Amino acid sequence: MAKDPGRVLIFDTTLRDGEQSPGASLNLEEKLAIAQQLARLGVDIIEAGFPYASQGDFKAVQRIADQVGGEEGPIICGLARASKADIKACAEAIAPAPRKRIHTFIATSDIHLKHKLRKSRADVLKIVPEMVGYARSLASDVEFSCEDAARSDPDFMYEVIESAIAAGAGTINIPDTVGYITPAEFGDLIIGINKNVSNIDESILSVHGHNDLGLAVANFLEAVKNGARQLECTINGIGERAGNAALEELVMALHVRRRYFNPFFGKDSESPTPLTAIRTEEITKTSRLVSNLTGMVVQPNKAIVGANAFAHESGIHQDGVLKNPLTYEIVDAKTVGLAENRISLGKLSGRSAVRARLEELGYDLTREDLNDAFARFKDLADRKREISDRDLEAIVSEQVMQPEARFKLHLVQVSCGTALRPTATVTIADQDGIENTAVALGTGPVDAVCKALRSLTNEKNDLIEFSVKSVTEGIDALGEVTIRLRRDGKIFSGHSADTDVVVAAAQAYINALNRLVYSLKKSSLHPQHDVVKANL
């Protein structure tokens, strides 16, 4: 059997696989903010990125390793393809972290070998021990993944795994790269590895999975029952295509059903010892932070963190919950950090109260960023009686956590009505502070604003999504707008919140456009799609 640490290790890949979601691109400060919150959440390993992809990715991993990694903190991990250049860059990026890991991989399925890598099985059996050994010479903690393991020939994969462990891999990861496998099959796959890999007891077994068939979490739980002790997951389940296994769902399944899972760890079913090291009360704020910074909206009926996860419409359900929450709720909302504000913030609140609440929400702002956020808070407080946590989150993500600004919005003015053709006047400033103004007509005020902005910026793009939602309740609620732009097949998200949704739409468009322009400055490789040309 594989090594058993006595609990499940949570390997968070929000900053690597999660960021590969269309439109979820993050800048360095946003990645750092998420990494710091992941550390508060208690994840065991943070996969901070793919350092070889670009200089920007390298710097982000390096900064996280320096500022988030610690003797008592999470292991900081970087991804590397099975190539010396990738592995060397990864080792250099994670070097500042006291506890660090190199995660290298190569595909093992015949379809990937033939059509992507154009390599034989013999080639892979030669590359794996060489590259794992090289990684092991640079770091004491090495993880190896068999990409597309779910569609690989088991006997060949056993051979690859055995060679990786012999070369120094302390963790073996089994990815369901395309979300193909079913729970029973995944359990059998883990059983087969434990049974047929002679040196598996020298390594921890890990799993990674995508949600293309909606089975990722179920697959992982079956893998845990059969010996997997590391779960690679993301906050809110974000990731390529249909996403990854959701961290919050996995953790709470193991928490709520601990008595069921305990025997699979050799424990008494009544053992109160948690099966993960996650601080569950940090789940909600982590979910909201990731949603705000990526622009990836959490669906209302999403388990654990969706807006409706603890809502009851039926009268019968409401009556039962009022008498005893356990009648219809298997999770106490407070367990995942869903609680009312302890401090009521309004126009008389000072900087210290705002800073304290932001710190509780997971935001560690610089003095300059705090000044910007506080100025925005005071502006909003003049228009709203009370400021909620969601308002604060919207302020920070809009005002502070934004990409380098090439364009800044200075003026939005619209005229519309039953007898008027919607007209927008917009003024923006470029990075040199030069202002330009445009006027445009549209089918509505938002359409007119977007047309004016498009004419001012001269950046080609297609607006593929516009959505607006109320951040809080009441007539004075903030309206949060999300806009997605597409260019050359890539998607860029922008979001903003304001009591005036037209202003929010204009700022969201500018934010998306700044992300688009920022991305043009860096040319990033994709760890799976870009093939290593030579192992040099």
UniProtKB/Swiss-Prot annotation:
Keywords attached to this entry: Amino-acid biosynthesis, Branched-chain amino acid biosynthesis, Cytoplasm, Leucine biosynthesis, Manganese, Metal-binding, Transferase
Any one of the GO CC terms: cytoplasm
SMART domains the UniProt entry points to: LeuA_dimer
GO molecular function terms attached to this record: 2-isopropylmalate synthase activity; acetyl-CoA C-acetyltransferase activity; manganese ion binding
Cofactor(s) required for function per UniProt: Mn(2+)
CDD domains associated with the record: DRE_TIM_IPMS
Region (Regulatory domain): 408-536
Keyword Metal-binding appears in the UniProt entry: yes
Localisation per UniProt entry: Cytoplasm
UniProt binding sites for Mn(2+): D17, H208, H210, N244
Domain Pyruvate carboxyltransferase stretches: 8-273
Record's catalysed reaction(s): 3-methyl-2-oxobutanoate + acetyl-CoA + H2O = (2S)-2-isopropylmalate + CoA + H(+)
EC number: 2.3.3.13
Gene Ontology process terms (BP): L-leucine biosynthetic process
Pathway assignment: Amino-acid biosynthesis; L-leucine biosynthesis; L-leucine from 3-methyl-2-oxobutanoate: step 1/4
Keyword set includes Transmembrane: no
Chain's role: Catalyzes the condensation of the acetyl group of acetyl-CoA with 3-methyl-2-oxobutanoate (2-ketoisovalerate) to form 3-carboxy-3-hydroxy-4-methylpentanoate (2-isopropylmalate).
Subunit structure: Homodimer.
Entry's family note: Belongs to the alpha-IPM synthase/homocitrate synthase family. LeuA type 1 subfamily.
PANTHER family: 2-ISOPROPYLMALATE SYNTHASE 1, CHLOROPLASTIC-RELATED, HOMOCITRATE SYNTHASE-RELATED
Record-given protein name: 2-isopropylmalate synthase
Annotated source species: Prochlorococcus marinus (strain SARG / CCMP1375 / SS120)
Gene this chain is encoded by: leuA
